[in-house]
């Protein structure tokens, strides 16, 4: 029996327990989850890609089959009404025989309009959970998406079972493979469209399989927060690359973002490295008992410090925050819950009745304000951008005088930076799935080798690897340094703690392994 099969037993027991609790509280006979229906395009005979009801796929990994139903009361084995038509035009799904099938009483549905025979006869005290209210009404349901039931399920969706965490680790593994392929395509000078194709091939996803539409942006396009266009022609000069792309496994999402500088040199490369350090520090601040909004405020402080340190704004970090300047350069929230949905539900909830957890003052548009607790999964995605419209708004204010507009003009062609990981909060530790689950290939050991002879498991441009405390055959200063690899030029730099990087090797390195940092 595979690991997922073992974990699934506990998962279904958890869902049964939650269902039993809410139907007792609301005096219901049960809950009916509808997977959904295919939607036909207007004035056409083709359908939009099917997207399953997330509350349905919480129960089982059936994400591509409309007209399915689950009837659950928390005590009896749930009934799965599985749509399996007679159809010579399309591929018909196989009868369920995977590990999860044993946990359901399964009845096959040949025609969608025959489902009434398989649903409870008296539906007065059954809650319908789904999108198609007109279908529910026609079938005799009176309670459709009742707010107390929805709030209860949404609140508890934030607490992942071990099965769900295992699925999310797999989704991250898939996404990491895509990111590696996309990164390599960027350094080969490919177009946005070609980079997207490399990503899809590496993940073995179609665009419809992805958890969301990928953002693949080069140069100035990195400043467009939700850039979903793919230029077919490569730019004359590659400067920067921002990729926000995920994956799907059993209906669970990964959501990863990386930013690269093409040359690995210059101020934008330093800016990327600085934002990476802040992103890792913010990830490490996740802890049970904190409000997620507190991390968002700290992120603004860090962005302000970066703006000040790089002389983009001629003020101290505290002054930049006080004047509200950071919102021009960092206009979105720090992150969100992730799970069955990329922006998973329950992020604003203070309790299972649906009470709203207020955001920090001055930040009304956050996707997550909730108290952090164990078994929750978050994204952490700080950013720093040079967005024309927001810079124009800033220029029209009194804060205009504090901006180094020449520096802004130098950095605008790079667009912006965003770095994003997916993190599990445990009772006494954190698990950064994105970084800890990166693929590791065999490398030469650092121990006892001279600098030009080793390779490092780190693909990111100007990424850092602090080597073991055991000495290399170099002077003490070098022992305390950080080695930096630029994968396109395959040069090794060493960054001393107080000095600028110096080149210590220019000869070709052994093959650099491919992970994601």
Curated annotation (Swiss-Prot):
So where does Mn(2+) 1 get bound? 255, 336, 381, 420
UniProt keyword Manganese present: yes
Catalytic activity entry: Xaa-L-Pro dipeptide + H2O = an L-alpha-amino acid + L-proline; diisopropyl fluorophosphate + H2O = diisopropyl phosphate + fluoride + 2 H(+); An aryl dialkyl phosphate + H2O = dialkyl phosphate + an aryl alcohol
Spell out the temperature dependence recorded for this entry.
Optimum temperature is 50 degrees Celsius.
Pfam families to which the protein is assigned, alphabetical: PepQ_N (PF21216), Peptidase_M24 (PF00557)
**Transmembrane feature ranges:** none
GO-annotated cellular components: cytosol
Q: How is the cofactor bound?
A: Binds 2 manganese ions per monomer.
Q: Which residues of the sequence carry a binding annotation for Mn(2+) 2?
A: 244, 255, 420
Sorted alphabetically, the keyword list is: Detoxification, Dipeptidase, Hydrolase, Manganese, Metal-binding, Metalloprotease, Protease
Biotech and industrial use: Can be used for the catalytic detoxification of some nerve agents neurotoxins.
Signal peptide residues are: none
- What does the record give as cofactor? Mn(2+)
Activity's dependence on pH: Optimum pH is 8.5 with DFP as substrate.
Q: Provide the GO biological process annotations.
A: proteolysis; response to toxic substance
Molecular function GO terms recorded: aminopeptidase activity; aryldialkylphosphatase activity; diisopropyl-fluorophosphatase activity; metal ion binding; metalloexopeptidase activity; proline dipeptidase activity
- Provide the E.C. number(s) assigned to this enzyme: 3.4.13.9, 3.8.2.2, 3.1.8.1
Please give the function described in this protein's UniProt entry: Splits dipeptides with a prolyl or hydroxyprolyl residue in the C-terminal position and a nonpolar amino acid at the N-terminal position. Also catalyzes the hydrolysis of toxic organophosphorus cholinesterase-inhibiting compounds including insecticide paraoxon and nerve gases such as diisopropylfluorophosphate (DFP), O-isopropyl methylphosphonofluoridate (sarin), O-pinacolyl methylphosphonofluoridate (soman), and O-cyclohexyl methylphosphonofluoridate.
Homology family? Belongs to the peptidase M24B family. Bacterial-type prolidase subfamily.
Assembly information from the UniProt record: Monomer.
Q: What additional remark is attached to this entry?
A: Has a stereoselective preference for isomers with R-configuration at the phosphorous center of sarin and soman, and with S-configuration in phosphotriesters.
**Name of this protein:** Xaa-Pro dipeptidase
């Amino acid at each position: 029996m595979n690991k997922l099969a073992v974990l699934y037993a506990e998962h279904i027991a958890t869902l049964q327990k939650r269902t039993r609790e809410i139907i007792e509280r609301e005096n219901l006979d049960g809950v009916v989850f509808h997977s959904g229906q295919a939607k036909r395009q207007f004035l056409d005979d083709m359908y939009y890609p099917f997207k399953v009801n997330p509350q349905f796929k919480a129960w089982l990994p059936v994400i591509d089959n409309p007209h399915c139903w689950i009837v659950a009361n928390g005590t009896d084995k749930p009934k799965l009404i599985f749509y399996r038509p007679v159809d010579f035009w399309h591929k018909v799904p196989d009868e369920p025989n995977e590990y999860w099938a044993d946990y359901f009483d399964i009845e096959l549905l040949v025609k969608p309009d025959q489902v009434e025979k398989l649903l409870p006869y008296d539906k007065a005290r059954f809650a319908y959970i789904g999108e198609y209210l007109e279908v529910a009404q026609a079938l005799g349901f009176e309670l459709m998406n009742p707010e107390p039931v929805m709030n209860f399920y949404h609140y508890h969706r934030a607490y992942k079972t071990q099965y769900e965490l295992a699925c999310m680790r797999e989704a991250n593994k898939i996404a990491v493979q895509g990111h590696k392929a996309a990164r390599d395509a960027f350094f080969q000078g490919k177009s946005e469209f070609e980079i997207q194709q490399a990503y899809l091939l590496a993940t073995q996803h179609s665009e419809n399989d992805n958890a969301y539409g990928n953002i693949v942006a080069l140069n100035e396009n990195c400043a467009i927060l939700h850039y979903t266009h793919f230029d077919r022609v490569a730019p004359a000069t590659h400067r920067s690359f921002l990729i926000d792309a995920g994956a799907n496994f059993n209906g669970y999402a990964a959501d990863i973002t990386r930013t690269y500088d093409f040359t690995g040199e210059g101020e934008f490369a330093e800016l990327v490295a600085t934002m990476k350090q802040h992103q890792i520090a913010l990830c490490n601040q996740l802890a049970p008992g904190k409000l997620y909004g507190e991390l968002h405020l700290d992120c603004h402080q860090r962005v302000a410090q970066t703006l000040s340190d790089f002389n983009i704004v001629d003020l101290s970090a505290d002054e930049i925050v006080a004047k509200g300047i950071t919102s021009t350069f960092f206009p979105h929230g720090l992150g969100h819950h992730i799970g069955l949905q990329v922006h998973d539900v329950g992020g604003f909830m203070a309790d299972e009745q649906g009470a709203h957890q207020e955001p920090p003052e001055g930040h009304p548009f956050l996707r997550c304000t909730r108290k952090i607790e164990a078994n929750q999964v978050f994204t952490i995605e700080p950013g720093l951008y040079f967005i024309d419209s927001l810079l124009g708004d800033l220029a029209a204010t009194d804060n205009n005088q504090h901006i180094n507009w020449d520096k802004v003009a130098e950095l605008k062609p790079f667009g912006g930076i965003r770095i994003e990981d997916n993190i599990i909060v445990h009772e006494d530790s954190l698990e950064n799935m994105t970084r800890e689950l990166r693929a590791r290939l065999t490398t030469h050991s650092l121990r006892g080798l001279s600098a030009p002879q080793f390779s490092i498991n780190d693909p990111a441009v100007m990424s850092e690897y602090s080597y073991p405390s055991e000495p290399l055959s170099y002077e003490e200063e070098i022992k305390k340094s950080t080695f930096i690899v630029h994968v396109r030029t395959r040069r090794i730099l060493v960054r001393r703690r107080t000095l600028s990087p110096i080149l210590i090797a220019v000869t070709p390195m052994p093959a650099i392994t491919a992970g994601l940092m």
